[in-house]
Amino acid sequence: KVNYTLSEDLREASLTVVNTGGKLDSRSPIEIQLTKDEMKAGSYLETILINSVNLIDSSIYTYTLNGIDSARNVADEYTVSSIHYDITKPVIDLIEPTENGALNSALVTYDFSETMLQTDLTITRIGGTPDTLSPHNVEVVMYELAAGRVDSAIITNAPTSTDGAIYRYEFKGVDLANNASNVIVADNVLFDNT
């Protein structure tokens, strides 16, 4: 999908897509000719061009839009670089705490298959000692969103859990391309620090 605005109707226009990194796209450069309807003056939002092609997941591209109007004036080309094409859903693995496990501190171990834009870690009391602040919606921030495994970490915004409470941990998120992750749940986690 592309977004673009044309100030006037064009006689000719093309979008050139060049693979500049990530996975190799052997078809690069790809030249996509715009159709007559796609060359009319106006704004185009989230548009799938008629002659578009499937790109390669995990490739990085540069897009350049060129055009000529009916008087054969050449428009200034417009280029957008470093477009990371990503259609793969990220995977979150919550390693610690484990379902039916116990914790004596707010340590968690998790693994992200790729860097996340945002994650939601919700810790909800489901039994044991009452926790009047439950559910805890934990904001995972900055370096905590990086791809890879994080071992036995106390998340920056970790809540204070209640001794003797039993919790459900639910972890989900979206990657930099807004692909939604799986939802991972660990039920019946006892917090016991005495």
Residue map of PLM features:
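Structural beta-strand segments of beta-rich domains
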Residues: 1-2, 104-108
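Conserved structural position at the C-terminal beta-strand
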Residues: 65-67, 171-173
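Flexible, low-complexity linkers/stalks enriched in Thr/Pro that connect modular domains
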Residues: 79-93, 175, 185-194
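Aromatic sugar-binding surface patches on proteins
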Residues: 38-50, 141-155
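Short proline/glycine-enriched turn/loop motifs at strand-loop junctions of beta-rich domains
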Residues: 7-12, 112-118
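Short, solvent-exposed loop/linker segments at the N-terminal edge
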Residues: 98-104
